[in-house]
C-alpha cells in the first residue's frame, strides 16, 4: 500500500446537512452507485493539444480532474464514520507497460495544465518501463480516470474495489467524428444526477475552450456554473 500525501478536508456537520436524509437512504442500498456515459465534443481539445505539442491524453486527463474538483459532491467521502469534503482531489490513471499490462500512476492536482504535466510526465514515462501492478493507496482523496482509446463506446459499467465505493471512476474513449465518450460512476449517497450533470458541464467547458486549462483557477473561476452549483 502506498501512503499518499496528506490531504486537507473539512468535516460536514450532518445534523444540519441538507443532504442528510438522502445520504442515509442511499447508504442502505446494496449498491448505491450509478453509471452515466455522455458524448462530448473534443475536436478543439485535440487540435489544441496538437498545436501546443502537448499530450492529448494528459490534456484530457487534466480537464476531467479539474472538472471533478469543481463539483463539491465529487469530493465528499466517509472517513472515520464522519462525512468529509476534501479540498482537492488527485487522479489515479492506468498507463500501459511494455508487456501490454498496466501500472497505476498517481497524479496530483495542479492550478493549471503546465504544472500538472510537469509533475505527471516523469511518472508516466517511468511507468511504461516497469512491470504491471495495481496501486493501492491509503485514503480516498482521488478519482480514477482511464483512457480506452481503442473504442468509441456508448455505455460502460465500471468495476468497483468495494461495492458502493465513493471514489468516482471515469473512462474516456476514442475520438470519433470530433466526439469522445466520457463514462462515469458516481455514488448516489453523495452525488445526484444534478451534480453529475454539473460535472459533465465543466468537462464540456474545458474540452470546448481548452486554452482555459492553462489559466490558474481562482475562487470566482472555480466553476462556470451558478452559485447553486457550489452548494453543499
State where each predicted segment sits.
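Flexible helix-coil linker/hinge segments at domain or subdomain boundaries
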Residues: 205-225
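Plant-skewed but cross-kingdom recognition/interaction modules and surfaces
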Residues: 96, 123-128, 132-135, 171, ...
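Intrinsically disordered, low-complexity linker/assembly segments
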Residues: 154-191, 196-204
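Helical lid/core segments from catalytic subdomains that handle acyl or acyl-like groups
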Residues: 97-153
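Flexible, Gly/Pro-enriched loop and linker segments at secondary-structure and domain junctions
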Residues: 4-37, 57, 140-173, 214-216
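Gly/Ser/Thr-rich phosphate-binding loops and adjoining beta-strand/alpha-helix segments
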Residues: 5-9, 26-59, 75-89, 168, ...
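Small-residue-rich loop/turn and linker elements
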Residues: 74-106, 132-135, 218-225
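Acyl activation and transfer enzymes in specialized metabolism, enriched
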Residues: 45-70, 180-199
Amino acid at each position: 500500500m502506498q501512503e499518499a500525501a496528506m490531504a486537507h478536508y473539512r468535516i460536514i456537520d450532518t445534523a444540519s446537512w441538507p443532504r442528510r436524509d438522502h445520504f442515509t437512504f442511499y447508504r442502505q442500498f446494496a449498491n448505491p452507485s450509478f453509471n452515466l456515459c455522455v458524448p462530448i465534443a473534443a475536436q478543439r481539445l485535440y487540435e489544441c493539444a496538437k498545436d501546443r505539442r502537448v499530450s492529448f491524453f494528459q490534456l484530457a486527463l487534466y480537464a476531467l480532474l479539474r472538472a471533478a474538483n469543481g463539483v463539491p459532491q465529487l469530493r465528499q467521502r466517509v472517513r472515520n464514520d464522519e462525512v468529509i469534503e476534501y479540498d482537492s482531489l488527485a487522479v489515479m490513471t492506468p498507463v500501459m507497460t511494455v508487456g501490454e499490462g498496466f501500472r497505476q500512476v498517481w497524479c496530483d492536482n495542479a492550478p493549471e495544465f503546465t504544472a500538472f504535466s510537469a509533475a505527471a510526465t516523469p511518472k508516466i514515462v517511468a511507468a511504461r518501463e516497469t512491470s504491471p501492478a495495481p496501486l493501492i493507496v491509503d485514503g480516498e482523496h482521488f478519482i480514477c480516470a482511464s483512457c480506452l482509446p481503442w473504442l468509441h463506446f456508448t455505455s460502460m459499467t465500471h468495476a468497483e474495489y468495494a461495492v458502493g465505493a465513493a471514489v468516482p471512476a471515469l473512462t474516456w474513449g476514442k475520438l470519433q467524428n470530433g466526439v469522445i465518450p466520457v463514462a462515469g460512476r458516481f455514488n448516489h449517497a453523495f452525488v445526484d444526477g444534478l451534480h453529475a450533470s454539473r460535472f459533465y458541464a465543466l468537462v464540456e467547458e474545458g474540452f470546448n475552450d481548452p486554452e482555459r486549462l492553462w489559466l490558474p483557477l481562482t475562487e470566482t473561476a472555480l466553476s462556470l456554473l451558478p452559485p447553486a452549483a457550489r452548494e453543499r
